[in-house]
Amino acid sequence: ISVITSAIEHEAILDNLAQLKRRGFTVDILKPGTHGVIEPGTLDAAMGDDVALVSIMFANNETGAVQPVGELAQIAHSHGSYFHTDAIQGYLHAPIDVSVLRVDALSLAGHKVGASVASGALFLRRGVPFEPLIRGGGQEAGRRAGTQDVRSALGLAAVARTLYPRLDEDHARVLSLSGCLYERLLESPRIHATLPDLVHTDRLPGIASILVDGCESEELILQLDVRGFCVSAGSACSSGSTDASHVLTAMGIPRERAAGSLRISFDDRVREQDLNAFADALLDLTGGARS
C-alpha cells in the first residue's frame, strides 16, 4: 500500500507517514517546483494502482504558497485514491470550500485563528473509511474517544462565526498590506522574496517569506526581538531548530541561502504602521535601501 505526500508538508504529516513507512507502507514524497507548488502533472506521474491516499497541504505554513488542491484531488480520484489536505494554515485566512475542492478529508486547527490550542476539526466526506487513533468511550461519533472539550469547541465555532463573514474583505486588505511590506523590504539589495512570482497573488496574505544575503536567521531574529518584533526562521512549530528549513531546501534553495530565511506572519489585526515599523527595523539591520 502506498501513500503520496509532498516534501513541503508540516512535520505533523511527514513524521506520521515516516511511522507508517516503518510499518511497511510505501511513502512517496513529491518535490515542489522552485515556486513552491506541487504541479498536478507531478502527482499524476507518481500515481499507481497501489496508492491508497494522497495528502497535500492546502497552503504552506512557511512560504504561504497555495497548492492547487482541487486539481490534485481530481487526479487522485481518477486513480481511485482518497485525498486529504492539511488546511490548518489556510483556514479562515483564505477561501476554502470542500464542495469545490472535492477533498475526502480536511483537517484544521483553532490556534491559527485565535481559538484554543486544544481545538480543531476534521471534515470527512460521507462514506470515507475512518479508524480512530484513540479508542474508548466512543465520543465524537466513535472517531476520538475521551471527554469532549466543549469550551474549546465552542470557542472555535465562535471564531468561525466572527471571521468567516468578513473573510473576503480581510483577505484583500491583508494581501494589499503584505504586498506593500514586500515592496519596502525589497528596497534592500540584500533582501529577496523567497517566492518572487507569488508576491502579489496565489499565496496566503498573512505570510511574508524572505531570504537575507550574508545574514544568519538566528542573529536577525534576536536583533528584531530586541526591537520589539517576533519573527521566525521557518515553521513556528520548529522553534529552537538550527537546521535549514526542509521546505526551502525541497524547493532547491541552497542551505547557505536558506540559513538567512525569515518568516514574517501577521493576521487581520495588523496595521500599516506596524508593518512599516518592522520594515524600517529590518532595513536598518541589513544596511538600508538601495541608493
Predicted segments, located by residue:
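Pyridoxal 5′-phosphate
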Residues: I1-S291
